């Protein structure tokens, strides 16, 4: 199963995260299928590849709870329901 989840990077105690599509059995910091965005919890900076995320969600990818909250704040789920599934 493909999951949209956070991949940690950055210095010790100064973590930043990439939002990635990965197999759910892969390591947290393993090689992703696709990088879809960036999240910095220290500054609340979020950058998303919305078309890529919408495509993955329509293909059946499941976001983790944290990624789901980030996507809800950015109104990505509204775009998923607005576009017809291909």
From Swiss-Prot:
GO biological process: translation
The keyword Ribonucleoprotein belongs to this UniProt entry's keyword annotation: yes
GO cellular component assignments: cytoplasm; small ribosomal subunit
Assigned keywords, A-Z: Ribonucleoprotein, Ribosomal protein
Family annotation (PROSITE patterns): RIBOSOMAL_S16
Gene Ontology molecular-function annotations: structural constituent of ribosome
Entries under NCBIfam families matching the protein: S16
Family, similarity comment: Belongs to the bacterial ribosomal protein bS16 family.
HAMAP family, alphabetized: Ribosomal_bS16 (MF_00385)
Protein's name in the database: Small ribosomal subunit protein bS16
Organism: Nostoc sp. (strain PCC 7120 / SAG 25.82 / UTEX 2576)
Species lineage: Bacteria, Bacillati, Cyanobacteriota, Cyanophyceae, Nostocales
Gene behind this protein: rpsP
